[in-house]
Amino acid sequence: MYNVIFLGAPGSGKGTQGEVVAKELRLAHMATGDLFRKAIERGDELGDTVKSYMERGELVPDEITISVVLKHLAGLKDVSGIILDGFPRSLRQAEALDEALVKQGEGIGRVIYINVPEDELVRRLSGRWVCRSCQSPYQCGCAEVAEGKCSRCQGELYQRPDDTPETVKERLKVYFSKTAPLIEYYRSKGKLSEIDGMAEITEVTKRIVSAIKCGK
């Protein structure tokens, strides 16, 4: 199985790119944020715990994240590969993933780092609205946000609690202190491909696909 990690700060576009690239390359797509939001929707103890961290802009503790993700990965069947979006987010998570994959006789094929300047990240996140049904993102000022309706599935748009200006600053602070070190971790292993996230969306997709294919 060919495993690809998407790294990037909140607002870098890794979620959008993960979905598009997964479809193009026929890979499974796992977004940690989606797994957590499903837990929150269930309203169980795990969901309540996850919600409290996400609303403060903090990372969900490693032990919880590792358990949720590895359980999900173990349940995947008949897939040729997977794009991991939002995991790992710390060196401890990266080491846990490496260990789990080695036990299965697998490894990381390629790590895609989508690089976007911090001021642009703040702009994107503070103005981001998301569809409750399909999770499609929209920027403040577009027709869909004005109407409050998703153009893809007609679902209701809302602003996530973790996308408010105050929480955005905390999320980025956490990212640069805990997740950014993974860039050098994977670069040292010769697995990292850095992509300019300021390019047009279609161009970013093209560069990511090329990097993954070249890394195989």
UniProtKB/Swiss-Prot annotation:
Annotated EC = 2.7.4.3
A Pfam family the protein falls into: ADK
Which residue intervals make up region (NMP)?
31-60
Can you tell me which residues bind AMP? 32, 37, 58-60, 86-89, 93, 160, 171
- The gene for this chain is adk
According to its UniProt entry, one GO biological process term is: AMP salvage
Q: Which family does it belong to?
A: Belongs to the adenylate kinase family.
Q: Where does the UniProt annotation place the signal sequence? A: none
Cited Gene3D superfamilies: P-loop containing nucleotide triphosphate hydrolases
**Role:** Catalyzes the reversible transfer of the terminal phosphate group between ATP and AMP. Plays an important role in cellular energy homeostasis and in adenine nucleotide metabolism.
Q: Which enzyme class, named as a word?
A: transferase
Q: Which GO terms describe its molecular function?
A: adenylate kinase activity; ATP binding; metal ion binding
Q: What keywords were assigned to this record?
A: ATP-binding, Cytoplasm, Kinase, Metal-binding, Nucleotide biosynthesis, Nucleotide-binding, Transferase, Zinc
The UniProt subunit note reads as follows: Monomer.
The record's InterPro entries line, in alphabetical order, gives: Adenyl_kin_sub, Adenylat/UMP-CMP_kin, Adenylat_kinase_CS, P-loop_NTPase
Annotated Zn(2+) binding lies at 131, 134, 150, 153
Q: What positions does the entry give for ATP binding?
A: 11-16, 128, 199
Give me the reactions it catalyses.
Answer: AMP + ATP = 2 ADP
Q: What is known of its domains?
A: Consists of three domains, a large central CORE domain and two small peripheral domains, NMPbind and LID, which undergo movements during catalysis. The LID domain closes over the site of phosphoryl transfer upon ATP binding. Assembling and dissambling the active center during each catalytic cycle provides an effective means to prevent ATP hydrolysis. Some bacteria have evolved a zinc-coordinating structure that stabilizes the LID domain.
What GO CC annotations are associated with the protein?
Answer: cytoplasm
Species per Swiss-Prot/TrEMBL record: Dehalococcoides mccartyi (strain ATCC BAA-2266 / KCTC 15142 / 195)
Coarsely, its chief localization is cytoplasm
State what protein this is by name.
Answer: Adenylate kinase
Q: Which NCBIfam families match?
A: adk, PRK00279.1-2, PRK00279.1-3, PRK14527.1
The protein's location, in the record's own words, is:
Cytoplasm
User: Pathway involvement?
Assistant: Purine metabolism; AMP biosynthesis via salvage pathway; AMP from ADP: step 1/1
Ranges for region LID: 127-163
